[in-house]
Amino acid sequence: FIRNLTLRQEGNTLVLFQFVEKHGKILHDMINDKDSERKVFFVYGGTDTDQRENIRRITEGENDAIIVASYGTFSTGINIKNLHNIIFASPTKSRIRNLQSIGRGLRRNDTKVSCNLYDIGDDMSWKAKKNYTLHHMVERIKIYNEEDFSYKLIKVDL
């Protein structure tokens, strides 16, 4: 689902994930294997600073690049004005991390007037087991309401 959502987006897309091996690398490979025409970058803690800067520079000049990056490396401290879409591919409830991550897409440039955020929340409910993924989504919705963000919830049956 996340791969297909990413590939359907127009413009540059940032996909943020939590765990490098369990999420990020697999997602990067799935996206890259499906579309070899687009530039698809993978950024995590092991990506050196010069390479990150090169990816940032390339993305500023592109209109169809995909960056699959860990929250730790791209949720704060990176300035790419030419981002059109952000996808939260892993659940988190941190207010600061969420707002900083959204801020990646709010940088203005001459051609961009908006940025789309896709915040994915899975309902992994089963019997009486606590569903942290859904709980984190509810916490993020509270943040969006407090910040007066415009959003809509879409249920997707898989």
What is the predicted role of each segment?
Residues 12, 149-158:
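Long, largely alpha-helical accessory region at the distal end of helicase-like NTP-driven motors
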Residues 11, 36, 79-82:
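Amphipathic alpha-helical protein-protein interaction surfaces
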Residues 1-30, 144:
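Conserved strand-helix element at the start of the C-terminal RecA-like helicase core
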Residues 44-147:
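Conserved RecA-like P-loop NTPase helicase motor core
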Residues 14, 28, 32-54:
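Conserved RecA-like helicase motor-core motifs
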Residues 40-42, 117, 151-153:
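Conserved beta-strand scaffold positions in the cores of enzyme catalytic domains, especially
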Residues 11-12, 19, 38-39, 63-65:
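Short coil/turn segments at beta-strand junctions that form active-site/ligand-binding loops
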